[in-house]
Amino acid sequence: MVYWLMKFVFIGPLLKTLWPTKVVGAENIPETGGVILAGNHLAVADSFFMPLRVKRKVTFPAKSEYFTEPGLKGLLKKWFFTGVGQIPIDRSSGNAAQAALDTATRLVREGHLLGIYPEGTRSPDGRLYKGKTGVARIALESRGLVVPVAMVGTDKVNPIGSKMWWPRRLEIRFGTPLDFSRYDGLSGDRFIERSITDEIMYALMELSGQEYVDIYAAKAKELIAAEAAGVKAKVPEQPTGRAADRVPETKAG
């Protein structure tokens, strides 16, 4: 109930008014069944604008700290994050990453629409970075379809480090569903999982038009911070020639 109130009464109408959004390919999202929406990640705003344009409820995993803070502020945070479709993930255990994967897999198996960002964190410069293989593990273990989602322009609405949201026209592109059922039973094979992840990132690259960089976004942030501190470090440019073989251009299988 809270989710739909947030979407259609409290937040949704305002977002739709201030940020007109062109939506392409929404019909690619199955009307029923467990599905993974795998998106590029440009800004915090992604998790607001994308669910707003999807008919079904979208669930995102979120750190449990958002739901356990004491006092009135904590209650408001819990209400808000529950309302926008996020569920708590306990990251305090020794195997927090596995706990997150297990929760995400369970949600898809139960027929939910799961939102996930394979890059693992926001892009520091608007480029598309190497995907983490957790998305492949979830797809294999849940047997859910993967729909690539390209967010375009949210980094201009909500730039990293900015507390303001600026009026801009946005675009959200939903790609053709990817079916990895041909790999049933191969969860845990790191080569298969990497190949599947690369196929998803390739689809995102084509859908978004972003330049692809074959390192993790978290590493890119480290390099950018080092460069800002005066250390000679540089985020690699898009490879060409033989180096381009490292770009995820071969689809799994």
Pin down the residues of each PLM region.
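Short beta-strand-to-loop junctions in surface cap/lid or active-site-entrance loops
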Residues: 23-29
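Generic structural signal for residues in well-ordered beta-strands
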Residues: 21-23, 86, 172
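Alpha-helical membrane-targeting segments
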Residues: 1-18, 70-85, 163-169
